[in-house]
Amino acid sequence: MTKQHPTDDIKIREVKELLPPIAHLYELPISDEAAGLVHRTRHEIADLVHGKDNRLLVIIGPCSIHDTKAALEYAERLLVLRKKYEKELLIVMRVYFEKPRTTVGWKGLINDPHLDGTFDINYGLRQARSLLLTLNNMGMPASTEFLDMITPQYYADLISWGAIGARTTESQVHRELASGLSCPVGFKNGTDGNLKIAIDAIGAASHPHHFLSVTKAGHSAIVHTGGNPDCHVILRGGKEPNYSTEHVKSAAEQLIKAGLSPKLMVDCSHANSRKDYRRQMEVAQDVAAQLENGEDNIMGVMVESHLVEGRQDKPEVYGQSITDACIGWDTTEEMLALLAAANRKRVAP
């Protein structure tokens, strides 16, 4: 680069050093209890994906985490229900730290943990790992969405199930990432409802890949993966909802035609709820009816839930989402009871 004709970093205002993953892993090492829970839960979810377990996987929790205190209170309440319905449901808490934005907005606890535009990402990564460690130590397995190739090195060892979102399912690097993740992964259909891109993603992620990332020491590296056989589709709706009996049957047929497991998950939120959080219960009721009628290709559901229903722009109400609106705790209890009863009937001899 010359002073007369600069060509590099022209639009970059600042570059800050990021602490390497090993710094956080050293200060917040995974415990034997947490490792055992993650190991067991991953295997249980894999069994669900491959039809070896007849429980229903329930990924449930806040749209995003912005207050770790509220997240822990939510987890304590959810843990009671996890134990209560352990024969019918495999409950895993939704713990999302990064939010893909359609345009702009708060991008999550990791990106801006103080909610003030300071973008203290080093602190955000530490907060994320600390929360995940606490959750696993208390017996609550965690799930999250993976958005890039670097942050998984900071906390993926504490994740039991991962999601690739509707905006990134078609992305080559996210398919490559999924091929190397140690946990089962769900791929959402596209925002327009396109299911083929999710089916293609599962096929791609099941194969080995080479991609660029970083080591635990923070050095640039070429990662060679072995492929992930434990991936599945998430029906999240598109231009219209896609959770009905007909949609589930069609999706299962397409998966079988592609040589994949027909087991799939239904997202009760997003386009399936027509972006109205109250309609998540309607979706759950429809899924419950399908389960009672013997539908065995639905292996899981995803629900956006918090202590207080609705949403807010600023964190003024404790336990309420600042991103997508969520159902409240009372509705959460009703929904889990409904799903547990339905699955109990599905597997009854």
Please give the residue ranges for each predicted region.
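Conserved, mostly hydrophobic/aromatic
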Residues: 61, 266, 328
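Active-site-facing alpha/beta catalytic cores
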Residues: 2-7, 88-243, 247-248, 270-271, ...
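Conserved phosphate/anionic-ligand binding catalytic regions in large, soluble enzymes, centered on
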Residues: 57-70, 324
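Short helix-capping segments at alpha-helix termini
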Residues: 83-87, 257-259, 293-296
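Glycine-rich phosphate/diphosphate-binding loops that line cofactor/substrate pockets in enzymes
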Residues: 46-54, 256-260
